[in-house]
């Protein structure tokens, strides 16, 4: 796990190290971005990445269901700095989960890559 330690001795858990997206040299913690977007998106969603020639990894937002994309993009622009904003937003039928109901990040990454390459959601 990764944490931010403050000068007063308190700390905040940011998420798992393996969920860090390196996009153009900027380290983006997927769970931290999800927390920032939680109040804006009222359906299940996940931040993941796809390979990108220029950036290394491109931040990708998978959203369960069908929402108005323009409205979502406007909300995201209002709360996230440009370098944190998802480069791609994809609507999916469902967010892959483990047997315990947690987000299956490995499957989400594969799904995002398949959709990015023009494949279909399975």
Residues of each region from the PLM?
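Acidic/polar alpha-helix N-cap and adjacent early helical turns
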Residues: 111-122
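Compositionally biased, intrinsically disordered low-complexity regions enriched in proline and serine
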Residues: 84-85, 117
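Short, conserved catalytic or interaction motifs in soluble domains
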Residues: 97
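AMP-binding/adenylate-forming catalytic core of the ANL superfamily
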Residues: 2-84, 94, 107-110
């Amino acid at each position: 796990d990764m944490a931010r330690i403050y000068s007063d001795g308190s700390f905040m858990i940011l998420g798992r190290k393996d969920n860090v997206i390196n996009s153009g040299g900027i380290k983006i913690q997927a769970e931290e971005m999800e927390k920032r977007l939680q109040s804006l998106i009222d359906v299940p969603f996940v931040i993941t990445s796809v390979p990108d020639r220029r950036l290394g990894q491109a931040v990708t937002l998978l959203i369960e269901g069908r929402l108005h994309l323009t409205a979502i993009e406007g909300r995201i622009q209002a709360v996230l700095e440009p370098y944190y904003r998802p480069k791609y937003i994809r609507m999916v039928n469902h967010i892959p989960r483990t047997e315990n109901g947690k987000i299956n990040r490995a499957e989400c990454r594969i799904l995002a890559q398949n959709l990015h390459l023009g494949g279909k959601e399975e």
